[in-house]
UniProtKB/Swiss-Prot annotation:
It comes from the Bacteria. Its EC number is 6.5.1.2. This is DNA ligase. Zn(2+) binds at C408, C411, C426, C432. Keywords: DNA damage, DNA repair, DNA replication, Ligase, Magnesium, Manganese, Metal-binding, NAD, Zinc. Its cofactor is Mg(2+); Mn(2+).
Length: 670
C-alpha cells in the first residue's frame, strides 16, 4: 500500500508542475498526450483506492492558478473542462453511459464541433456591450484580459439584435491561424526575437501580454462554443440553435458544426474532420461531442470537473516524447545542408517516427539541443516530423554537443553560410552528387545553354545510369549511349548530339547563368559578363570589385566568390572551357538620349501582355537602361505587369516609382 501512496503522490506532483508550466508560464515541457496519460494513470489509481482521493488532487479541478500580474476574476458559473476519449471503443462507452443515465435506447442527437487548440476565454456582455474578458484559470478564478481581447477584431465589442440578454457570458477559444503563426515566427527570426513552438503557445503568449499594444499586433481570432452566465434573457433549448443565436448577435462560430443522430453519424463526422484536419488552416486536436437538447444536458448534470453530457473525442497525438540518438546532415537538391535527428522510434499521429528535421543551425541553438536529449517530436498532417522542444529536466549527464560540418558530407566541398541567412549550403554546385540532377537541368535549360530536346526525364536517366556526373560530361556523350535511354531512338539521339554541339557556341552571360551560382539570375549574369568581359577577370575579382557591378550586393558577391573559388567547381569549369566558347561581350554603346529610361536601373516584374520580357529588356537596354533582376535601394523604376508579387511589394516598401506596362510602352515611344 505504501508504494501505491508513493506512486499517487509522485503523479500528483508531476501533474501540478506541468499544469503550472502549461497554464501559468505558457511553457509546456511535455506533449498533451503525455499529460493525458499521467492524468489517466492517476484517475485509475484513485478509482481503485477511493480512500486516497484528496480535494487538492489534480483530478478534482480543471487547471492551474492565474498569474498575479493580472487582476483576478471569479467566474460566476465555473468554467469546467471536458473528459476525453481516444478511440471509437471509448466513445461508444461514453454514448452508452449517456443512454443508461437517461434510461433510453433511442438514438440521441449530438452537436459535434471542432476541438480548437487555443486558449479558453469567457466574454461577459452587459446590455450588449463587452465589459469583461477572462481566461479560464483554474475554472473558478481566471485572469482579467479585457484590454487584450478588445484588440481581437473577430470579437464584437457590442452585440446586435433585439433579443440580447441583459447579461450573457459567452465562452469560446482564442487561437492563431497557421498562416499568421508562420508569419509571426518568420518575423521573430528576422529580428532575433522569441520563436513559438506551436500556434497554441503563440496564442496563449499573445493573449496574456501585459501590454495590449503587443497583443494588437498578433494575428489572433476567436470562435465561440457555449454560454455560462445568462441573466435577463432567454436562449433556445438546443445547443446548435444557441450557436446560431450567437452568430446572429455577431459572434464568430465555426462553420464545421453538425448535428449527428446516433453513434454511427458521430463517428463518421469524427473521421471526416480527421481527414480534413490538415487543410483547415488552424490547429485542432479532436472533436467535441455534446448532447444537443439542453433539457437533457440538465438531466445528465456534471461530475467533479466535467459535464456528463459532453466529451472530447481526441485525435491520435501529434506530439510525443522520445530520445535523440544521433544527428546527421543531409544535402538537398539546391545544396541546403539540413540537420536531421535520428530518434528512438516512437508512434506519432499513427505513424512510427524515427527521424525528424532540425531545419538549421539557428534552430539547434534555439532549442538548446544536444545528442542524447529527451525531446518532443511533432508530426502534423503530411508535415515532415520535427523536434519542437527539449525536456531539460530529463537531460542525462552524457549528452554531446552537435557540431555543424564545415565540409559537405556528400562531396567534401566547402560549406558557406552568408551572414543574415539561416541556411548553410554546399558550394560544390557543379560537382556535388546531391545537387547533380538540378544543376544539370538548369545548365541545359532554355535561358541557359538551351540544349533543345534535353528534358528533365533524360537528365534523370543520364544521372541514374551514371553516364553524367557534371555539366562537362554532357559534351562527352555519344549517340550510342543515348540510344540506351527509354524512348530514345537513333534519330532522337543524333538530334540531341547535334543540339549539344550547337550549345557549345553561346554567350558569356548565358554561360554564367548556366553555372547556377546562387542568386545569379539572367540580369545579374548579363551585368557580370558586361562588366568583366572574360572569365579570368571575373575569377580575379574581390568582393569590393564584384559589388561595383549593378545588381550585385554583398550577399551575391559572396555567393559568386565562394562558387568560383571552390576547387571542385574550378575543375568542372576548366573542362567546360575546353568545349564551350563565346564571343567577347560587346560593350553596349548608348547614344545620348533624352529617354526617361537612360541611366536608370529598371526591374521588370509580373506578366507582360504587349511585349515579351526579352523584347522589353532589349528595348530598355537600347535606351540606356540597366535591367536588373532584383529590387534594391539602387533601383530607380519598377515596371509591374499582371500578377506582380514580392518585387512590387518591396518597391512599394522602399518608395520606388512603379509604372504599368501601358505606361512603359508610352515612354518607349517618346
Amino acid at each position: 500500500m505504501e508504494s501505491i501512496i508513493q506512486q499517487i503522490n509522485q503523479l500528483r506532483t508531476s501533474l501540478r508542475h506541468h499544469e503550472h508550466q502549461y497554464h501559468v508560464l505558457d511553457a509546456p515541457e511535455i506533449p498533451d498526450a503525455e499529460y493525458d496519460r499521467m492524468m489517466q494513470q492517476l484517475r485509475d489509481l484513485e478509482a481503485q483506492h477511493p480512500e486516497l482521493v484528496t480535494n487538492d488532487s489534480p483530478t478534482q479541478r480543471v487547471g492551474a492558478a492565474p498569474l498575479d500580474a493580472f487582476e483576478q476574476v471569479k467566474h460566476e458559473v465555473p468554467m469546467l473542462s471536458l473528459d476525453n476519449v481516444f478511440d471509437e471503443e471509448s466513445y461508444l462507452a461514453f454514448d452508452k453511459r449517456v443512454h443508461d443515465r437517461l434510461k433510453t435506447a433511442e438514438p440521441l442527437t449530438f452537436c459535434c464541433e471542432l476541438k480548437l487548440d487555443g486558449l479558453a476565454v469567457s466574454l461577459l456582455y452587459e446590455n450588449g456591450e463587452l465589459v469583461r474578458a477572462a481566461t479560464r484559470g483554474d475554472g473558478t478564478t481566471g485572469e482579467n484580459i479585457t484590454a487584450n481581447v478588445r484588440t481581437i477584431r473577430a470579437i464584437p465589442l457590442r452585440l446586435h439584435g433585439d433579443n440580447v440578454p441583459r447579461r450573457v457570458e459567452v465562452r469560446g477559444e482564442v487561437f492563431m491561424p497557421q498562416a499568421g503563426f508562420e508569419q509571426l515566427n518568420e518575423e521573430a527570426r528576422r529580428k532575433g526575437g522569441k520563436v513559438f513552438a506551436n500556434p497554441r503557445n503563440a496564442a496563449a503568449g499573445s493573449l496574456r501580454q501585459l501590454d495590449p499594444r503587443i497583443t494588437a499586433k498578433r494575428p489572433l481570432t476567436f470562435f465561440c462554443y457555449g454560454v455560462g452566465l445568462l441573466d435577463g434573457g432567454e436562449l433556445p433549448r438546443s445547443h446548435i440553435q444557441c450557436l446560431m443565436q450567437f452568430k446572429a448577435w455577431g459572434l464568430p462560430v465555426s462553420e464545421r458544426v453538425k448535428l449527428c443522430t446516433g453513434s454511427d453519424q458521430v463517428i463518421a463526422f469524427y473521421r471526416q474532420i480527421e481527414q480534413d484536419r490538415a487543410g483547415l488552416g488552424f490547429d485542432i486536436d479532436g472533436v467535441v461531442i455534446k448532447v444537443d437538447d439542453l433539457a437533457l444536458q440538465e438531466q445528465l448534470g456534471f461530475v467533479a470537473r466535467a459535464p456528463r453530457w459532453a466529451t472530447a473525442f481526441k485525435f491520435p497525438a501529434q506530439e510525443q516524447i522520445t530520445q535523440v540518438r544521433e544527428v546527421e546532415f543531409q544535402v538537398g537538391r539546391t545544396g541546403a545542408i539540413t540537420p536531421v535527428a535520428r530518434l528512438e522510434p516512437v508512434q506519432v499521429a499513427g505513424v512510427i517516427v524515427s527521424n525528424a528535421t532540425l531545419h538549421n543551425a539557428d534552430e539547434i541553438e534555439r532549442l538548446g539541443l544536444r545528442i542524447g536529449d529527451t525531446v518532443i517530436v511533432r508530426r502534423a498532417g503530411d508535415v515532415i516530423p520535427q523536434v519542437v522542444g527539449v525536456v531539460m529536466e530529463q537531460r542525462p549527464d552524457d549528452t554531446k554537443e552537435i557540431t555543424f560540418p564545415s565540409q559537405c558530407p556528400v562531396c567534401g566541398s566547402d560549406i558557406e553560410r552568408v551572414e543574415g541567412e539561416a541556411v548553410a549550403r554546399c558550394t560544390g554546385g557543379l560537382f556535388c552528387a546531391a545537387q547533380r540532377k538540378e544543376a544539370l537541368k538548369h545548365f541545359v535549360s532554355r535561358r541557359a545553354l538551351d540544349v533543345d530536346g534535353m528534358g528533365d526525364k533524360i537528365i534523370e536517366q543520364l544521372v541514374e545510369k551514371q553516364y553524367v556526373e557534371n555539366p562537362a560530361d554532357l559534351f562527352q556523350l555519344t549517340a550510342g549511349k543515348l540510344t540506351g535511354l527509354d524512348r530514345m531512338g537513333p534519330k532522337s539521339a543524333q538530334n540531341l548530339i547535334a543540339a549539344l554541339e550547337k550549345a557549345k557556341q553561346t554567350t558569356f552571360a548565358r554561360f554564367l547563368y548556366a553555372l547556377g551560382i546562387r542568386e545569379v539570375g539572367e540580369a545579374t549574369a548579363a551585368n557580370l559578363a558586361a562588366h568583366f568581359r572574360t572569365l579570368d577577370n571575373l575569377r580575379a575579382a574581390d568582393i569590393e570589385t564584384l559589388k561595383s557591378v549593378p545588381d550585385v550586393g554583398e550577399v551575391v558577391a559572396k555567393h559568386v566568390m565562394n562558387f568560383l573559388s571552390e576547387e571542385h567547381n574550378q575543375k568542372v569549369i576548366e573542362e567546360l572551357e575546353k568545349v564551350v566558347s563565346w564571343p567577347e561581350p560587346q560593350q553596349i554603346v548608348v547614344e545620348e538620349s533624352d529617354s526617361p529610361f537612360a541611366g536608370k536601373t529598371v526591374v521588370l516584374t509580373g506578366s507582360l501582355t504587349i511585349l515579351s520580357r526579352d523584347e522589353a529588356k532589349d528595348r530598355l537596354t537600347a535606351l540606356g537602361a540597366k535591367v536588373s533582376g532584383s529590387v534594391s535601394k539602387k533601383t530607380h523604376l519598377v515596371i509591374a505587369g499582371e500578377a506582380a508579387g514580392s518585387k512590387l511589394a518591396k518597391a512599394q516598401e522602399l518608395g520606388i516609382k512603379v509604372i504599368d506596362e501601358a505606361e512603359m510602352i508610352r515612354l518607349l515611344g517618346e
